[in-house]
């Protein structure tokens, strides 16, 4: 047993320090980023926000809507190959280039991924997604997928430390997904005692990834646009959002009417709700590691994504970053004990 004494920080532990800026307006800030990925050699240009691959977030409808802003969606893995065939038939490259095909690590998952990727050349992203990215099995699976799809962009996770980021990149991942336990409907940290404050995880993992020419996704922990900016400021190349994009028309969640008001069900992918739906209940050797909540129905996602992007642009003007890619270079974080004045309630 050992104890690490270094302080680890989450998004609520810091604020950006403002800096002199030559920018006159938020409209001058460029949020689009251009990436060339290490192993696949693929190029991608867009706003590096990703809707999470959760049942009630990462839907085909969400992908079609967010692609209008060049924002990505990681499509959840519970659609069938036939579902994907319909989606491919009804959408063009502008949508498909911004859709990630999510998969687990079983033999059936591998075959299903092959069948989906065979539908069109316009699908270029594969997201290998398991809760515990520290499994040796994940490294072997990444190698297997890389051998099968040498020109596709592969994302793998989730992990929170630089050593595992490096191992996954060396195994063939272009992007590593970073985050264990920070999500709004995730209870892994409570059930297992395992986790890592998200901002520190992003700072440390981005350093490891960038040293090898890889990229990272900061996955989880964002509850407002300021948190998304902090993730980018910490070095995340992409930021994945679940709860912030849940509860919308395009989220594809179950709508429930209660006392005359409309709500949408939102749950973690290791929750009782998810396992009841996809696995016939919680297996007797495990515990649910997610919660189920009802969110007020929020209408179309358009206003929300505009609000998030507007917040990031505003962050950039405060620190003098004319482009999103400059934000991490311009960022100085100050440690704080309060974020906002809540005398009239929270934002």
UniProtKB/Swiss-Prot annotation:
Active-site feature positions: 186
UniProt keyword NADP, yes or no: yes
Protein name listed in UniProt: GMP reductase
Binding site for K(+): 181, 183
Family to which this protein belongs: Belongs to the IMPDH/GMPR family. GuaC type 1 subfamily.
GO cellular component: cytosol; GMP reductase complex
Catalytic activity reported: IMP + NH4(+) + NADP(+) = GMP + NADPH + 2 H(+)
Highest taxon of source: Bacteria
Cross-referenced SUPFAM superfamilies: Inosine monophosphate dehydrogenase (IMPDH)
Any Pfam family the entry gives: IMPDH
InterPro entries referenced in this protein's UniProt entry, alphabetically: Aldolase_TIM, GMP_reductase, GMPR, IMP_DH/GMP_Rdtase_CS, IMP_DH_GMPRt
Protein's organism: Photobacterium profundum (strain SS9)
Function description: Catalyzes the irreversible NADPH-dependent deamination of GMP to IMP. It functions in the conversion of nucleobase, nucleoside and nucleotide derivatives of G to A nucleotides, and in maintaining the intracellular balance of A and G nucleotides.
Enzyme class: oxidoreductase
Sorted UniProt keywords: Metal-binding, NADP, Oxidoreductase, Potassium
Enzyme Commission identifier(s): 1.7.1.7
